From Swiss-Prot:
Binding site for sulfate: 198, 200, 296
Gene3D superfamilies, per the entry: HUPs (3.40.50.620), P-loop containing nucleotide triphosphate hydrolases (3.40.50.300), Sulfate adenylyltransferase (3.10.400.10)
Entries under Pfam families matching the protein: APS_kinase, ATP-sulfurylase, PUA_2
Protein name: Sulfate adenylyltransferase
Organism: Gibberella zeae (strain ATCC MYA-4620 / CBS 123657 / FGSC 9075 / NRRL 31084 / PH-1)
Amino acid sequence: MANTPHGGVLKDLFARDLPRQSELEAEAQKLPALTLSERHLCDLELILNGGFSPLEGFLTEKDYNGVVENNRLADGALFSMPINLDVNQAEIDQLGLKAGARVTLRDFRDDRNLAILTVEDIYRPDKVNEAKKVFGSDDDTHPGVKYLFDTAKEFYVGGKLEAINRLEHYDFLDLRFTPSELRAHFNKLGWQKVVAFQTRNPMHRAHRELTVRAARSQQANVLIQPVVGLTKPGDIDHFTRVRVYKALLPRYPNGMAALALLPLAMRMGGPREALWHAIIRKNHGATHFIVGRDHAGPGKNKQGKDHYGPYDAQVLVQEHQEELGIKMVEFQAMIYLPDSDEYLPINEIPEGTRTLNISGTELRHRLRTGKDIPEWFSYPEVVKVLREENPLPAEKGFTVFMTGYQNSGKDQIARALQATLNQGGGRPVSMLLGENVRHELSPELGFTRKDRDLNIQRIAFVASELTKAGAAVIAAPIAPFEDARKAARDLVEKSGPFFLVHVATPLEYCEKTDRKGVYAAARNGEIKNFTGVDDPYEAPAKPDLVVDLEKQNVRSIVHQIVLLLESNGLLDRL
């Protein structure tokens, strides 16, 4: 039998409000609407389906203060993470938000009405206090703190919700269970005791050994419930991770484990988050919850130390275990013993015993370089999934971004580089020349700084998508401003390698060899906002390569670029 929900009753607002769905939908069409962010949507889904029971809406000021200060709602119920709907003054004014007002909450992805919020109060939070009390610090290297300070808006709106529509998902539908559905699934399987395992990372043999040990220690089954909402920036995408979990599942003893996805927006809140995770798993029917080393920890702070102690989360959950109503299963790091081919918790290993380990950094290096990942660390079927999503450098897309004055030679270099890369084969080559982009992507833009920056932003977006798809991209705009170039690098590097090449041909040479007469026209005032004449050019501070067509020929410059690409493992051969 599944565990009792937190607070005694599962607050499944979808089930509660289903008889009134048509009525609520009709009302929602007439109300002002607030479009929710991705994080809001994650929170909303788990409020509406009962995953955040006993919550029935976003926190009012009384509830918020209780949670921040004491891990408790205003009625005394244990709850450790503030669930807030943040808005700005413009939204308050535009939507007429005030106590008693009703507002539709809308999905930004498909413009569907999801719920109606009845506003109870609007309040301005003390964000510094929230950061220190909830996350233990106001250090913005913590992603939860950074979000709070940089993204969360000025005011919070509290109030109860009425459910209209479920959020639409189009991936892994067979693994998406509401708390009610998962409880029914456990009952169908006849599971009496369920140990839940939280993860935001791929699982390897150590995780399998840990969860099997936990289940056997409690004579229970295992629920692998990975987060597929928002996790730590830089984490492996959930599509890859879920394929890993599915590949791993057959390695469990027959009938021991089940896999279900959790659409949670993590805060990386360490001890507080562990308590919150336990409440969520209790609502999903689990009777036990694994809390391991540095649970939901965000990594290092500004001093280079971990934000939380390795077992702080276990201490906090243990303090509230009796009231919490879900049993914590403590586990330390699992270490491999090659002489006996087994994993043991680090505190059970005799001193002097030979051990082996592969760090996360080393694993990423082996994936990048194609080096062997031994079976004692991870199963072949798991490694296969990870290698599919981590192609070798020679199989990846990349962007070569050239910047320089008009007539500096960028276009000639770009065309020659395109021919050279096409000769080598292995990936498609796309070219984004300044004039072509202006004609095809940005015909309405002028040459003000704002328009120039927008043009570079568009080039960067196209380059990032092509790079993600495995193409070699050669971009050659003037790109005169450092901030826009940095933004382009930041965007493209999310998809693959980015190389900034400064074509530093002197302005005098560019003007002297100008056969089109554009410099002369600019000097005569016929062309305005012309880079190098009446508009500035900011030389790159940290280019990956500097070339000069006055001193070099196109062939030698292309060879330099090819050598740069080859040294980064992006070309099989010269």
